[in-house]
């Protein structure tokens, strides 16, 4: 091959390599940007940040037993309540765990927390508020929590539990608190401090619910 032609080929190959390198660099940058955007969507794609740990995720909300006439439960206590709110309520965020979820003719999504003086179960359901009022008409009294309609329940069938039910658009959220051994030793009465716990956690439900 003529030396001049050889130099021309080498120069062309070098230029092509530079174009490929630039193209590859651009693709990598775009891929990284896309991955970053995907990560952001996973954090902000819902109406609010939620916990993503697999063991905390709720079950599917539809099955052959689900009654279509009831509204869908949006607030999931195990993935919506922040660690900061749990700590503010005097509970240990590290004890967060799913309780006994119910998805049938009605739905209740459940999360349990432990504390030094009290343990707490939070159940978010789509049973109508009116049904709840009727069920506990003889063992409850009305109250408000952060301006939200609520019910203080002292069920005679559960003497160790103090319940506060908070109305939502889907139905209500049931906060059920029980004293630990240390709480009983400290002289806590059945409902001592429970309203304060619920007051700290209620904002996590969200005004949209």
Predicted segment positions?
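Extracellular/mature segments of secreted proteins
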Residues: 84-89, 118-122, 170-171, 198-201
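Sequence contexts marking disulfide-bonded cysteines in secreted/extracellular proteins
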Residues: 23, 77-79, 110-112, 161-163, ...
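C-terminal motif of bacterial Sec signal peptides marking the signal peptidase cleavage site
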Residues: 18-21
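A short, solvent-exposed beta-edge/loop patch
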Residues: 141-209
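Short, solvent-exposed recognition patches
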Residues: 88-151
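Bacterial N-terminal signal peptides that target proteins for export
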Residues: 1-10
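N-terminal "mature-domain start" segment
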Residues: 23-102
């Amino acid at each position: 091959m003529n030396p001049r032609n050889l130099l021309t080929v080498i120069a062309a190959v070098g230029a092509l390599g530079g174009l490929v390198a630039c193209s590859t660099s651009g693709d990598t940058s775009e891929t990284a940007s896309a991955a970053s955007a995907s990560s952001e969507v996973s954090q902000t794609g819902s109406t609010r940040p939620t916990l993503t740990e697999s063991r905390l995720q709720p079950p599917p909300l539809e099955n052959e037993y689900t009654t279509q006439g009831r509204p869908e439960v949006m607030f999931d206590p195990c993935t919506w309540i922040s660690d900061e709110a749990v700590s503010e309520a005097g509970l240990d965020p590290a004890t967060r765990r799913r309780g006994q979820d119910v998805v049938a003719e009605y739905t209740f999504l459940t999360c349990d927390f432990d504390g030094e003086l009290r343990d707490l179960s939070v159940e978010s359901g789509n049973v109508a508020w009116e049904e709840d009022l009727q069920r506990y008409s003889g063992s409850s009294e009305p109250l408000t929590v952060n301006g939200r309609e609520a019910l203080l329940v002292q069920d005679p069938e559960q003497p160790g539990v103090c319940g506060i039910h908070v109305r939502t658009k889907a139905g209500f959220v049931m906060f059920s608190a029980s004293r630990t051994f240390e709480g009983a030793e400290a002289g806590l009465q059945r409902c001592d401090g429970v309203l304060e716990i619920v007051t700290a956690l209620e904002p996590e439900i969200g005004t949209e619910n």
